[in-house]
Design a protein with these regions (language model features):
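Hydrophobic/aromatic ligand-binding patch that stacks against planar heteroaromatic rings
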Residues: 142, 240, 312
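A conserved nucleotide-sugar
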Residues: 80-82, 238-269, 273-274
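Alpha-helical solenoid repeat scaffolds of the TPR/TPR-like class and their adjacent stem/linker regions
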Residues: 1-217, 225, 235, 265, ...
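Hydrophobic, well-ordered secondary-structure elements that form the walls
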Residues: 237, 299
Length: 312
């Protein structure tokens, strides 16, 4: 999928901001433009409250996006805003939970792009916030054709979309450097400290002693997406393991055999195959979080660092 290509390039150190800018402009020029006769016109009717929409495919199960979105939905001014979520996924416990925080959830997962576009236009949104960007199952084509009076990109894809109809990007000074703003199509809206806030987990919290005390060796760990673990990262981590005597590294990642084989091969080349322990996907959230108790020091990836993993 050409739209997913930009997301995966976020993990590629060779791409510059100019590359992302040109990629976005290419998509803007090549995404489908809907014929005027087939679409509902944008209304100029003024709403009583600011009507704000969120569009996502990731409000499901224990996907990280919901943990970030809840901080907004629990704290918005209900006297000034009416919030509607357009969910590009089937209804589940997460969407049911979010329903209690906002005005309405509309499920558009079974609609074609054009059907979803006209359905959303009926709600006369003042602002639509895309929290997917170029991630999987995105609906970026809707934003190309302008589904709301103002359109914003936030959260899911931390870069320019290249779409001339995308008005703003919500970010912070660490994500969008001041000297790179010229390579963003959107107007950059800086939050003062950080672009996002995790709501935390509703689980029992327990202090646990460092595993070093029992093991007598240091345990490093990373639970990041394996796509972020490139050869430069592996070589960096290998140097750390070699310099810290008898240390171990726990890597937890989904069962993506090809990526896992690639990671194991580089560690083996570096003579560290016995120092790295792999844990496969853990579906239960509490079991996943408990695995952190086996780690003394978390190691981060680069150029695309941990987000949800770092918050955890």
């Amino acid at each position: 999928d050409l739209c997913n290509y930009g997301y995966w390039r976020l993990f590629d150190k060779s791409w510059t901001q100019l590359d992302f800018y040109n990629y976005g402009k290419f998509l803007n020029d090549n995404l489908r433009k809907y014929p005027e006769k087939s679409i509902i016109s944008l209304s100029d009717k003024k709403n009583e409250k600011i009507k704000l929409g969120f569009l996502s495919s990731d409000l499901k199960g224990d996907h990280s996006v919901s943990y970030f979105l809840k901080t907004v939905l629990r704290n918005y001014n209900q006297n000034q805003f009416e919030i509607i979520i357009f969910n590009n996924h089937k209804e589940d416990k997460i969407s049911q939970e979010l329903t209690n925080l906002i005005n309405k959830i509309i499920h558009i997962g079974k609609l074609s792009d054009l059907e979803a576009f006209n359905n959303i236009r009926k709600y006369n949104l003042d602002v639509m916030i895309d929290i997917m960007g170029y991630t999987s199952r995105n609906r970026i084509e809707l934003f190309k054709n302008k589904i709301a009076k103002k359109q914003i990109i936030w959260m899911g894809y931390c870069n320019t979309t290249g779409l001339t109809n995308m008005d703003y990007i919500i970010t912070d000074p660490n994500l969008v450097l001041k000297n790179e703003k010229k390579h963003y199509v959107e107007k950059v809206l800086y939050l003062p400290d950080i672009w996002n806030c995790h709501c935390g987990f509703d689980i029992k919290r327990e202090e646990n002693p460092s595993p070093l005390i029992k093991n007598k060796y240091v345990t490093f760990g990373s639970f990041n997406n394996p796509a972020k673990i490139n050869e430069n990262v592996i070589n960096c981590w290998s140097n750390i393991l070699k310099r810290v005597k008898n240390s171990k590294l726990i890597i937890k990642c989904a069962d993506k055999r090809r990526k896992l084989d690639r990671i194991q091969e580089v560690f083996k080349k570096n003579g560290l195959q016995d120092s790295v322990i792999f844990h496969h996907r853990i579906d239960n959230l509490e079991d996943h979080l408990n695995l952190y108790k086996k780690i003394d020091i978390a190691l981060d990836t680069f150029p695309y660092n941990g987000v949800t993993t770092s918050f955890e």
